[in-house]
Amino acid sequence: VKILIEVPADGPLFEGHFPGRPILPGIAELVLLGRALPDPWGAANVSAIPFVRFRGLVLPSDRLEVSVESRGEDGIRFEVRRGAELVANGAMTFGAPRVEDGGATAVASRAPRSVPPIPELIPHRPPMLFVTRVVGVADDGATCIARVPGDCALVAGGSAPAFVALEAAAQTAAVWEALRRSPSSGSAEARVGYLVSLKDVVLHRGTIPADTDLIASVRLAAHAAPLATYAVDVTVEGELALRGTIGTYLSG
């Protein structure tokens, strides 16, 4: 299957990510792909994401050519190209959400002290600013409350694909990194970071409601600056929404 995605020159997909430096969020790239896939594939039917690698920034007015290969019950493999340049590739499986495995949710339990306002910690702005507050910190991670705003372009009909909660996890990781920098610099500093990879993401529901609290927890699994890998999970309405691993790149 071949799919052409015309990235708009501006508009809701770029609002808040990042002001003055518009970049299509990696998760938005997956939402656009999911919306373009034929049935029975589709963003709300994703049950797992074995891997995704975001290899290049997607900018306003980009023209993306997507090649999709069916793997039967194993879902799809896909490549996203801008001309000859590979900008993303990955795999998705589809079907009923996976049954929760019963693993404990990794919540950072130490109460944070003197946390600056979230907009001082990360460069995101509404409607792409999901994290609302920090509820716990640890030496290797953090737990934040987040919400997907109803006016976010990733929302349709009051809900978003469940994997959009990975953006809340990525922002939680960015908040923790900013807090970790503050003891050495004297103040927290908002720096642009990028979501560069997903691995072994298992989804326990098809969608998440907008304007509803999410609890996103991240724990550092590996670090080789400027790259970092985090084990993440997100719960909503008292139930696990997803669990997996993300990779981030901190610029500057």
Q: What function would you assign to each model-found segment?
A:
Residues 1, 56-116, 123, 143, ...:
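HotDog/MaoC-like acyl-thioester-processing domains
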Residues 1-24, 125-161:
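Catalytic strand-loop segment that frames the active site of acyl-thioester-processing enzymes
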Residues 5-7, 54, 94, 148, ...:
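Hydrophobic residues in beta-strands and at strand termini
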Residues 21-25, 29-30, 156-176:
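Compact, glycine-rich, soluble single-domain proteins
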Residues 33-67, 175-215:
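Hydrophobic beta-strand-centered segment that forms part of the acyl-chain substrate-binding groove
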Residues 40, 115-125, 187-190:
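Short aromatic-glycine motifs in intrinsically disordered, low-complexity regions
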Residues 48-51, 89, 132-136, 200:
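Extracellular/lumenal ectodomain signal focusing on beta-strand-rich modules
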